[in-house]
Amino acid sequence: MKVIYEDNHIIIVNKQAGEIVQGDKTGDRTLADDVKAYIKEKYAKPGDVFLGVVHRLDRPVSGVVVFARTSKALSRLNDMFRTGKIQKTYQAIVPATEKSVATPDGEWITVDTWLTRNECQNKAFSHQREVAGSKRAALDYRIIGRGDRYNLLEVRLHTGRHHQIRCQLSSLGMPIKGDLKYGSPRSNPDGSISLHACHIAFEHPVSHQVIDVTADYPDNKLWLALGGGNK
């Protein structure tokens, strides 16, 4: 666990792929557990440490995660996420497609579809029009790096649906590298998928100063070759 920013009200860390943010049926130790232990030791906190989970990243995804250290910060951050006042940026490595060859570098493309969720499969499905049980999902992406076989995309969400980036990119014929669930032909050696929450910016919930942080990239040559983090 790497701490990117901390103060009395919030703490921001760089989650590694494979870590879970909050407890699930596996019973595995969580990132929240590690952050609590860090706070307890660093500040010699007696008893239980308060830590509010504000948002999550899927287990195979890496990058920025924000936690609240006070109930005031948690309540306000929850409102900010709900009303779209948090700016999150992701980068993803996807296969280079014939269509992408004709797409100019840096040109933003909007994907606006409807997603349904299959709880049994823990998987989302994209639909071009509204269907029963679906929720609207929108994102923008652009190509910021190219290679012979893969492209590097920057992605910004307008909505925060379950597996949204993974599902919508896959529906365009661009499954994220290593994401077997959404059509990648093979897994990454470490079990990760090549999706990184690289940046977050928002107004501090208490001090109102601008918080603007970037998470270091996974130690992977392909990220470096495609220019991850340099755009």
Predicted features along the sequence, with ranges:
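RNA pseudouridine synthases
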Residues: 1-231
